Swiss-Prot record:
The gene is CMT2. Residues 863-928 form the Chromo domain. Residues 1-34, 142-189, 265-302, 442-468 are annotated as: Disordered. Residues 285-296 have a biased composition (Basic and acidic residues). This is DNA (cytosine-5)-methyltransferase CMT2. It comes from Oryza sativa subsp. japonica (Rice). Residues 1-15 have a biased composition (Pro residues). Residues 602-719 form the BAH domain. Keywords: DNA-binding, Methyltransferase, Nucleus, S-adenosyl-L-methionine, Transferase. The active site is at 941. Its main location: nucleus. Induction: By cold and salt stresses. It catalyses: a 2'-deoxycytidine in DNA + S-adenosyl-L-methionine = a 5-methyl-2'-deoxycytidine in DNA + S-adenosyl-L-homocysteine + H(+).
Length: 1319
């Protein structure tokens, strides 16, 4: 059995002598009184015979050195969740007003200690025992209560004092210390012994410190001021058998020993401070005892003032804990008036509770925690848009709920249940506050930022009002506040009042609140503005101002609160919380509403903004106050609508480029206790930026111009409200109704009347999958979106794009050089392009563009610049000299003699440069800022791809392959398009905590673009592959933010999205009936194609079958010549040509291996001869057989195949089957790593079959070698996915989409050409 730790403030007890009762039969470790120390101990404390029983342990404990000098055990966690304080029992304290109980709960034994019966009531003691226990002062015994051997004391000269009139020593920290010295005392060793023994008895069992903020299981409330309804008082009494009285060696009862009685007399007369926490009280007792020792012979005046006793209020489940020999808890009324009338000193005392451990006294005893109310950790914050369990109480303060990452997961219906990755328990049941799921970056200190946003301080700064109030309201409110300072104050029905400054509070003037023009009812402050004290905080009181809103008005204004009360609810007996039978979340039982509240020195009205307590060491939260209400359990709450800082959003640590004063409005609301409010803060709304630059912000603490939604990480513009209208509406709980999306139909002309054509720039275009899909979808929605410019550094991919989009200006250069070229082109246009130039001058230049000069007039020895035909930035001559170059057509020479010349060498050709710039500007050979409507592209992802084994995890931007995201955003910032579409692999959300994705989103928002992030699966839009891609949508602040299109097909999804971005997966909500077609499988796309062999080399061939499925009918119906509005011309597809239907030719060895793969579902390399599979699902060679060799002498089964994924992979040399889908289309077909063998033919899937897997029409042709074509297809965006996004873009541009992040596509969208009838 573990022994209790030694007292942290008492002198060490003397060790037992050999052979003594405490010596453990004379054990060597027990020790004894040293011969040289006997005289010293006798002089200080008395004879060992008298003192030894006091140090004896209680019955049942082991005896010896282990007990005599026990070491403090390290802190351990008890069942309540807090650290063990080193005592056998721990005090849970009392929380007033929360399920209080009048009965005294028996103490609970801590781990490692035996349970004892609770102390018998006082009235149950025999007369002798009662007299002993009810002496002049409360008796305090040491933990080690042994046999009393002291002689009987002489009879008392004074009559016994009645118990009710008996005084107790206050143990507190707030009362002033004794200033007058104690009267001198006679110097004697016995008196000195009394003082030292007093130190032992009083401080050997000090009260524990305040509950640690991390001891959430205690559920205790910190000591409160005089206004608290009840405070625990403690008396100590002997809990042993009252029939047995301990005696000394000479037969005298220990209780009546002379020294002990003197000690009790001195203890009764020692004044201690009041209203202090236990840890400070313990230290004060030490100091007082030392003072008494320093004044020899001093006598302390005894206090015998009356006190009033009351019953202790205990919260349900809280037990009074402590050693039964020393603890008996009673409750003393805290009524100030009653104590004054009785003539007694108003004291709050907690004494003789179990000793605290050294670690607690050392670490936490010196600090005083703020006096604030705490709640049990099992409580649940309720009535929130996103309800979740409360995180542990921070620093003893009330828990603050802010919905962010603690939002319940959403199951997306992308496929049948068995095909989906389970996403249950994303949050793990744990709660991460807003600066959590996402780690918040350290907030920067800005002079304009109020101190309340920074680290919490005990004195929050005083800030301005949250809103600019009307003059009429301000005047009335000022008069009301003035009256409040001198008016009368009525008592709260719950808690006794404390007079403040002996002032009174009078009635406040009537303050009308102007209602909205809708059906909202008027609420007026026509009641007496009286303060009702609710709680105590570190700065003062929290109280409601004014009487409650009348019930009928409150029900009209906040019907959702009172409808809950009228419905049938279940009651949880453990937490006294009420829940719906089918709601699945806790709700608050509201009693009444208020319109104003005061916290500390701030008066808050509904609609004002405030700081709300955040985690310890973290910035406070910011929110708007929507409701003030009291529950039927007597708790006061407020409802808050949150604002997000950039660090609080998904941007996280990538928010360095954002203004620290910029906030983001949100619809997330939560209910919190009233004392969570810290101080006021001023927040203003500013209009959205049109040119991407921040406008001047009015003088305020913060401002906001956008709204943030966790779903799909959406940043959207909100409508700028009139100040007066906003003020009128801010007093209602429906303030969110005023924060509507921008109604662009009212503020802008319809684009149908302005411009039905949009221009697109495709960066990193490849073969054109993304721009092709966007243009097809937009045209289907009624908007003519055309790709005017395309950029890629892959020359072969540029040829494929140019071949299929002849109207597009395709440039083969890097995006970095293209950005520099745009900047130089802008300078040239500003220099040479003048609007005053006549059209005739331009036309004359245009007419001579295609003419060939007369070579006979040019001397053969001279070269003359005839004209400039192109422009680029870079190093076209490969001479390691980057710069601006012009392509020169020499006079007398043809195009094949054109050369690239640097601009420095054309200083004498300003005329030619001017003509080229003017003509290029007219033909828009390069875009200028404002010329581009849509920028799309997918920055290269080799630096983050899972196939790259040399990724930079710690610093992603150190990799040159990852810097293209920066360049992409730089192009957007320069051109300022209306819409932005960026695509990337799913690994961008998995790699390095999604740093690159957060950066891209941060750049868009910093440029005042609306933004939205989503994850789309290709199989959900009519393809037999489960490739998932990330799409970042950006939109100008004055445009409609396009939604994500909902899936059209069930999909067989094999890869799940990252849990941190699970809410970004585009899918059907759980409460919406799905309208999905059956999944598309390989048979739907392959069954009509002619058979080809492994060595097929034809680039063109005819179809041998007609379309067998709806997918085949659609994919073969595109016109060969045009991809415009008439691209869906249907014709006899049997006579049409089929392009690129040839596979990658395998060498003879690999072809021999494919021949031995069976033509059945699931066949792979494990079916080859000589391979066995063990019970561990690992494929290995059969040791009993000789290894099979091919005719070339190489083994049939390669060692690299057996080592791939430790022999557990099923993909090497695998056959796909008719009813299956493929994972993704790779850039390099490799049968050794992927299942790419045709179901019925001994070959790999052809180029055309791979193109169909990506949704390319059959008339889309590719250039380059076979490997080049596979690579282009593998790098492309699936065309059906881009098509769905393009249709949603058209609906947003035409103002036909709603504000929701998702939209429903028309019926049979995947295989229909003409969709304008459904738009």
């Amino acid at each position: 059995m573990e022994t209790p730790p030694p007292d942290p403030v008492s002198p060490p007890p003397p060790a037992a002598d050999e052979g003594s009762p405490g010596g453990d039969d004379g054990a060597e470790d027990a020790g004894g009184f040293s011969a040289g120390l006997d005289s010293l101990w006798t002089a200080l404390f008395g004879s060992p015979e008298e003192l030894e029983p006091m140090w004896s342990p209680p019955r049942g404990f082991g005896v010896g050195a282990e007990f005599a000098a026990a070491e403090v055990e390290p802190e351990i966690m008890d069942v309540a969740g807090g650290p063990w304080d080193g005592a056998p029992w721990r005090s849970s304290g009392v929380v007033a007003g929360e399920g209080a109980a009048t009965a005294l709960v028996p103490p609970t034994a801590a781990a490692g200690f035996a349970e004892f019966e609770p102390a018998a009531p006082i009235d149950s003691y025999p007369a002798g025992a009662a007299a002993a226990s009810l002496g002049d002062v409360p008796e305090v015994s040491a933990l080690d209560s042994g046999v009393d051997c002291s002689p009987d004391p002489p009879p008392s000269s004074s009559p016994p004092v009645d118990f009710d009139a008996r005084g107790f020593d206050p143990v507190a920290d707030s009362a002033p210390a004794m200033e007058s010295p104690l009267p001198p005392s006679v110097a004697s060793s016995e008196a000195n012994l009394d003082g030292r023994m007093l130190d032992c008895t009083l401080n050997s069992v000090p009260s524990p410190p305040l509950a640690s903020p991390y001891e959430v299981g205690l559920g205790a409330e910190d000591p409160i001021k005089d206004s608290s309804p009840s405070v625990a008082w403690g008396t100590t009494m002997d809990a042993k058998d009252p029939e047995v009285d301990a005696t000394c060696a000479n037969g005298t009862a220990l209780r009546r020993s002379r020294r002990i009685m003197k000690i009790k007399s001195a203890a009764s007369s020692m004044p201690l401070n009041q209203n202090g926490d236990s840890s400070r009280a313990s230290k004060r007792r030490v100091a007082d005892s030392r003072k008494s020792r320093s004044s020899e012979g001093s006598k302390l005046p005894a206090f015998t003032g009356p006190i009033s006793v009351n019953t202790v209020d205990l919260i349900n489940g809280v037990k009074v804990q402590g050693l039964q020999e020393i603890v008996a808890v009673e409750n003393v009324s805290s009524s100030y008036d009653n104590n004054q009338k009785a003539g007694g000193l108003y004291n709050q005392v907690v004494v003789a509770l179990p000793a605290a451990s050294n670690s607690l006294l050392k670490d936490k005893g010196a600090s005083v925690l703020p006096r604030r109310k705490t709640r049990l950790a099992s409580k649940v914050l309720v009535n929130s848009d996103r309800v979740s369990a409360i995180s542990p109480v921070v620093n003893g303060g009330p828990p603050v709920q802010k919905s962010d990452v603690c939002i319940p997961t959403k199951k997306h219906k992308l496929a049948v249940e068995e095909c989906l990755t389970s996403l249950d328990g994303v949050d793990g049941g744990g709660i991460v506050l807003c600066n959590s799921k996402l780690k918040s970056a350290k907030s920067r200190v800005v002079s304009k930022t109020p101190q309340g946003r920074g680290r919490r301080s005990p004195q929050p700064p005083k800030t301005q009002r949250a809103r600019t109030l009307s003059v009429k309201y301000l005047e009335k409110l000022k008069r009301a506040e003035n009256n409040n300072n001198n008016g009368s104050m009525s008592k709260s029905p719950r808690v006794p009042m404390i007079p403040e400054n002996n002032g009174s509070m009078s009635k406040s003037p009537r303050v009308p609140i102007i209602p909205e023009l809708s059906t909202k009812h008027e609420l007026v402050l026509d009641k007496h503005m009286v303060d009702s004290v609710m709680l105590e905080t570190d700065d003062g009181s929290c109280f409601f101002v004014g009487d409650a809103v009348p019930d009928d008005e409150a029900r009209k204004q906040w019907p959702h609160r009172y409808e809950i009360n009228d419905q049938i609810m279940k009651k949880d007996k453990r937490t006294s919380s009420q829940t719906f039978a089918n709601a699945g979340k806790a709700v608050l039982d509201v009693k009444c509403h208020y319109l104003q509240a005061k916290v500390s020195r701030y008066t808050f009205c509904i609609g004002e903004c405030a700081f709300v307590k955040g985690p310890e060491g973290k910035p406070n939260y910011i929110g708007r106050l929507l409701e003030f209400f009291e529950t039927k359990t007597g708790e006061c709450y407020f409802r808050v609508q949150w604002f997000f800082t950039a660090e609080d959003t998904v941007i996280g640590e990538q928010a360095q480029s954002h203004d620290p004063r910029r906030l983001f409005y949100s619809d997330l609301t939560d209910d919190n206790l009233l004392d969570c409010i810290v101080s006021k803060v001023t927040i203003v709304q500013v209009p959205p930026s049109v040119d991407g630059k921040s406008k001047s912000v009015p003088s305020s603490d913060y401002y906001y111009d956008m709204k943030y939604s966790i779903d799909y990480s959406t940043f959207s513009t909100i409508e700028m409200e009139d100040t007066d209208d906003l003020m009128q509406s801010c007093y209602t709980s429906r303030i969110n109704d005023k924060m509507k999306k921008i109604d662009v139909n009212k503020k802008h002309k319809s684009p149908v009347l302005e411009k039905m054509e949009l221009s697109l720039l495709d960066l990193y275009c490849g073969c054109g999958g993304m721009s092709t899909g966007l243009c097809l979808g937009a045209r289907g929605g009624g908007v003519n979106l055309s790709a005017r410019w395309a950029i890629d550094d892959d020359e072969i991919a540029c040829e494929s794009f140019r071949n299929n989009h002849p109207e597009t200006r395709v440039r083969n250069e890097t995006t970095d050089d293209f950005l520099e070229l745009l900047k130089e082109w802008e300078k040239l246009c500003k220099t040479y392009v003048k609007h005053s130039r006549t059209k005739a001058c331009v036309d004359s230049t245009t007419e001579s563009n295609n003419e060939t000069p007369d070579c006979s007039t040019v001397p053969p020895e001279e070269f003359e610049v005839w004209k400039l035909v192109d422009i680029c930035f870079g190093d076209p001559n490969k001479v390691s000299k980057h710069g601006l170059y012009f392509k020169v057509r020499w006079k007398g020479y043809g195009p094949h003699h054109d050369t690239w010349e640097p601009v420095e060498g054309l200083r004498n050709c300003k005329e030619a440069i001017r003509d080229f710039v003017i003509e290029g500007h007219r033909q828009r050979i390069l875009p200028r800022p404002g010329d581009v409507d849509v920028v799309c592209g997918g920055p290269p992802c080799q630096g983050i791809s899972g196939y790259n084994r040399n990724r930079e995890f710690e610093a992603p931007f150190k990799c040159e392959k990852n810097k293209q995201i920066i360049v992409f955003m730089d192009v957007v910032q320069f051109l300022k398009p209306k819409y932005v579409y960026m695509e990337n692999v799913l690994d961008i959300l998995k790699f390095a905590d999604a740093t690159l994705a957060r950066y891209a989103l941060s750049r868009l928002v910093a440029m005042h673009y609306q933004a939205r992030l989503g994850i789309m699966a290709a199989g959900c839009y009519g393809l037999p592959q489960f490739r998932m891609r990330v799409f970042l949508l950006g939109c100008h602040s004055k445009e409609k933010l396009p939604p994500f299109p909902l899936p059209t097909h069930e999909a067989i999804v094999k890869n799940g999205c990252p849990l941190a971005f699970e809410r970004n997966l585009v899918g059907w909500p759980n409460d919406t009936p799905m309208q999905l077609a059956r999944p598309i499988v390989l048979e739907d796309i392959l069954s009509d194609l002619p058979e080809v062999a492994n060595g097929e080399s034809r680039d063109e061939m005819l179809y041998v079958k007609g379309p067998q499925t709806e997918f085949q009918r659609y994919i073969r119906s595109f016109n060969v010549e045009v991809h415009g509005p008439r691209a869906h011309v249907t014709k006899d597809s049997k006579s049409s040509k089929l392009y690129d239907h040839r596979p990658l030719v395998l060498d003879n060895d690999n072809y021999q291996r494919i021949l031995q793969i069976p033509k059945r579902k699931g066949a792979n390399f494990r079916d080859l001869s000589g391979v066995i599979v063990g019970p561990d699902n690992v494929a290995r060679l059969d040791p009993t057989k000789e290894r099979v060799l091919l005719p070339s002498g190489r083994p049939l089964v390669l060692d690299c195949i057996l080592a791939y994924e430790n022999g557990k992979s099923l993909r090497p040399f695998g056959r796909v089957w008719w009813d299956e889908v493929v994972g993704t289309v790779l850039t390099v077909p490799n049968a050794r790593m992927q299942a790419l063998i045709h179901p019925a033919q001994d070959r790999l899937l052809t180029i055309r079959e791979s193109a169909r897997l990506q949704g390319f029409p059959d008339n889309y042709r590719f250039r380059g070698t076979v490997k080049d074509r596979y690579r282009q297809i593998g790098n492309a965006v699936a065309v059906p996915v881009g098509r769905a996004l393009g249709y949603a873009l058209a609906m947003a541009y035409l103002k036909k989409s709603g504000d929701d992040p998702l939209m429903l596509l028309p019926p049979n969208f995947a295989f229909s050409h003409d969709l304008r009838g459904f738009a």
